[in-house]
């Protein structure tokens, strides 16, 4: 099952290439269907070569982002990226003919694979209901193109996607319109969402997600105070440090030079925080993929006195710029930029003959953690849980996040990473 989720995660590289042919009506419908069939076969064939767990793919993305942004706070959602693009892949599938056995077989495989994402989709909706998450997908289509309305209806139905028609020929006006609409829909002040836009752009996909987890056991607001956070050996900043003492999952790895704690959010979601030792942040990152699972396995419940900074992080990802940098470029079919997909009725053979369209895809994530995560009623209900029993003889382990650290928000049922990030400076959003 995890293998199928990995297939969908990897397929996002190819989905953007195939989306144009599936959304816009062309004169040669026969050609369109066969082109889509070939693209989907390549998605399946190339994805099957990768047998790693979805976490491995998330870590590859993480490494690429860190290489590009070594001194920035980072946060992204592998799950949100996968769900959004997988929904669009259904649009490609829906335009294909199922008259041939091989077409039907591929379609069934894709449907079966999408079932693996149903849990994540359901989880996302539950988090929205619990007011822990806001999620918005917006698809901007070139207003000068004739769109397949049946397909657009399917995308709206499956993903509740906001679809807007826009004229990309006036790039400055289009950039402002996109930023304004996204800000209005996501209730955020977004500046320079798109810095570079081609007037021949066919579509622009914006995926925005905001997460503010509700901890089952809140931090105590009266204990929050200003303290030093060490950005490096020479630089420190004053930040609001939260505190609490409670039983939580704790583990320590001398091999990884890191300490880990895990706290539950409301629902089947948990926050995993990893604190590399001073001077060992880069070393922990290198070993993270192989050692994180081991670190979680050796964890046990301990009484922990936790000190953690309040933070709010916003981070943007441009798919087009990122994907070629995550060691997946060699999996892409080699397409001459001067060619496009066509077919002949006699041979049913797909050849390549004109340029592929310009596409844009952006992923924006915001995450916030504070001591005010719980509602008043829940905070009162759990007040007793925050207190350490007076007769306890256990000495609490002190874990102080006063230097750069890593975070993971994980789905407890599938162990899927909902969010992955690094906090280098809690003062900077």
Swiss-Prot record:
Keywords: Glycoprotein, Pregnancy, Protease inhibitor, Serine protease inhibitor, Signal. SUPFAM superfamilies: Serpins. One of its GO terms (molecular function) is serine-type endopeptidase inhibitor activity. The keyword Glycoprotein applies. Secreted by ovine endometrium under the influence of progesterone. GO terms for cellular component: extracellular space. The record marks 390-391 as: Reactive bond. This is Uterine milk protein.
């Amino acid at each position: 099952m995890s293998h199928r989720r990995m297939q969908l995660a990897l397929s996002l590289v190819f989905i953007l290439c195939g989306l144009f042919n599936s959304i816009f009506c062309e004169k040669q419908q026969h050609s369109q269907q066969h082109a889509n069939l070939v693209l989907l076969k390549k998605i399946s064939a190339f994805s099957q070569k990768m047998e790693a767990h979805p976490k491995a793919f998330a870590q590859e993305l993480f490494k690429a982002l860190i290489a590009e942004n070594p001194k920035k706070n980072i946060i992204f959602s592998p799950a949100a990226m996968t769900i959004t693009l997988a929904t669009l892949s259904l649009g490609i599938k829906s335009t294909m003919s199922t008259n041939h056995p091989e077409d039907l077989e591929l379609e069934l495989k894709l449907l079966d694979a999408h079932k693996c994402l149903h849990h994540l989709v359901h989880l996302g909706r539950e988090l929205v209901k619990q007011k822990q998450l806001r999620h918005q997908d917006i698809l901007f289509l070139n207003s000068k193109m004739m769109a397949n309305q049946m397909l657009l209806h399917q995308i709206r139905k499956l993903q509740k996607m906001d679809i807007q028609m826009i004229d990309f020929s006036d790039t400055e006006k289009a950039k402002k319109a996109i930023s304004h609409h996204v800000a209005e829909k996501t209730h955020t002040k977004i500046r320079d969402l798109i810095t570079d836009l081609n007037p021949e752009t066919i579509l622009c996909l914006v995926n925005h997600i905001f997460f503010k987890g509700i901890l089952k056991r809140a931090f105590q607001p009266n204990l929050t105070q200003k303290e030093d956070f060490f950005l490096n050996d020479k630089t420190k900043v004053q930040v609001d440090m939260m505190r609490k003492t409670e039983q939580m999952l704790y583990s320590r790895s001398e091999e990884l030079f890191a300490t880990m704690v895990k706290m539950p959010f409301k629902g089947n979601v948990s926050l995993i925080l990893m604190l590399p030792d001073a001077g060992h942040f880069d070393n922990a990152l290198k070993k993270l993929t192989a050692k994180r699972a081991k670190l979680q396995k050796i964890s046990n419940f301990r009484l922990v006195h936790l000190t953690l900074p309040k933070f709010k992080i916003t981070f943007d990802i441009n798919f087009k710029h990122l994907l070629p940098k995550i060691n997946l470029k060699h999996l892409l079919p080699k397409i001459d930029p001067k060619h496009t997909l066509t077919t002949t009725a006699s041979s049913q053979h797909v050849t390549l003959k004109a340029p592929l369209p310009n596409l844009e895809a952006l992923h924006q994530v915001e995450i916030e953690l504070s001591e005010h995560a719980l509602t008043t009623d829940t905070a009162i209900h759990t007040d007793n849980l925050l207190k350490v029993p007076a007769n306890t003889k256990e000495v609490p382990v002190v874990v102080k996040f006063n230097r750069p650290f890593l975070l993971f928000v994980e789905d407890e049922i599938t162990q899927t990473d909902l969010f992955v990030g690094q906090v280098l400076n809690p003062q900077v959003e």
